[in-house]
Amino acid sequence: MLALAAYLILPNLLSKKEETSNNALDQAMNNKTVYSFTKQGELTFSDAKGNFITNIDIEIADTPEKRETGLMFRDKMEQNQGMLFLFSTEEPQAFWMHNTVLPLDIIYVNSKMEVVHIAKNAKPYDDTSLPSVKPAQYVVEVNAGFSDKYGIKNGDKIVWRTE
């Protein structure tokens, strides 16, 4: 019975997600929407012992709409900028690069503010799912190569403040 319900409901949910994404793309292309970075806070990376690594200015994606759009359609982002995605619970996450122009490092962070996985050099426009591997409550997107440049790895920590 559960399998039948999933069979009937899942295709409908997937088609709605596709419709939303296509509508957002159509709207952005028709309106020639230009997205620019808006600093909403600052995020600091530190190693597992608390030693400072680096910090970045962040935009915050804390609503379903902001999380769905993320960094889509952006054609530039400075090296000291990124986006922090906030989720209400820690659970497996998965991101994709649909309509995302810039190559990114996608940093998954658990509820203890520890990096649990990094999807490095995610390819622009790629619809392949990039899973968190372990449960995550936060996700930080930065330019591709950022993690390697600063040596960010699993076990490192983040902390942020809003403006």
For each of these PLM feature ranges, what is it?
Residues 1-2:
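Hydrophobic H-region at the start of alpha-helical membrane spans
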Residues 6-163:
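Compact, glycine-rich, soluble single-domain proteins
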